[in-house]
């Protein structure tokens, strides 16, 4: 059968559309998308003010971390409540961007850190298979996944945990070096000096606590090597959930 120019055009358009659909499916990588939460914790006796904390994802996307408890000085080392309001699944992170001020050593820390991508993906796959996903949210449908917890300890020490049911994996441990903040890091309503921004960042820290910290209280603590006790603290809850059929994980 002889093809005329119009038929050739239609065939070319069909091939183009099919190629576009295949490309979108491959680039979307649905098999590498998961629900997860991202939070930051710090020791209660080492106040921090987080300027930025977020994960960089493939395709120029990003995922912000929940920093509210840290910036309100309500954080407890190793303790985080996993929640997420994702409207859609996300690719897994490749890097962490972090910028924060530390009250007790009067330093500013900033860095971009590479994450162990293969280890993260493997952990998610295994946790899904072993039914270790946490219930992160029931908003607009139930969302199950794992929780990234970024720990900012004293002396510039940083740790990242990945958590699920009876699951806690240390992904990264790093000691950051103090840096001089850039002009953009000192902006709040207007450009501030380092001293003025520091005053703003910690203005809600009570004078009584400032006095306690100046006296050296908890000054020799080594939080980066302190076990989080995450599994120990949640064991009773998980046992109850197992017994009553709320989770399917079998230990």
Say what each PLM segment does.
Residues 109-137:
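Short beta-strand elements
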């Amino acid at each position: 059968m002889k093809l005329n120019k119009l038929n050739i055009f239609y065939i070319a358009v069909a091939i183009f559309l099919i190629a576009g659909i295949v490309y979108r499916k491959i680039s979307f990588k649905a098999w590498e998308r998961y629900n997860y939460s991202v939070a930051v914790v710090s020791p209660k006796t080492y106040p921090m003010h987080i300027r930025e904390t977020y994960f960089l994802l493939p395709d120029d996307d990003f995922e912000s971390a929940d920093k509210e408890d840290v910036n309100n000085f309500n954080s407890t080392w190793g303790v985080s409540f996993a929640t997420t309001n994702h409207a859609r699944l996300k690719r897994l992170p490749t890097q962490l961007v972090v910028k924060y001020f530390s009250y007790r050593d009067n330093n500013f820390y900033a860095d971009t850190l590479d994450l162990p991508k293969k280890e993260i993906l493997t952990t998610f796959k295994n946790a899904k298979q072993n039914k270790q996903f946490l219930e992160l949210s029931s908003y607009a449908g139930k969302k199950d996944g794992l929780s990234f917890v970024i720990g900012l300890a004293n002396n510039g020490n940083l740790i990242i945990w990945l958590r699920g049911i009876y699951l806690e994996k240390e992904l990264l441990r790093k000691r950051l070096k103090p840096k001089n903040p850039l002009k953009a890091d000192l902006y709040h309503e207007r450009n501030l000096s380092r001293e003025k921004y520091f005053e703003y960042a910690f203005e809600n820290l009570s004078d009584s606590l400032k006095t306690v910290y100046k006296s050296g209280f908890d000054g020799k603590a080594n939080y980066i090597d302190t076990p989080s006790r995450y599994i120990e603290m949640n064991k009773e809850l998980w046992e109850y959930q197992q017994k009553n059929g709320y989770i399917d994980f079998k230990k």
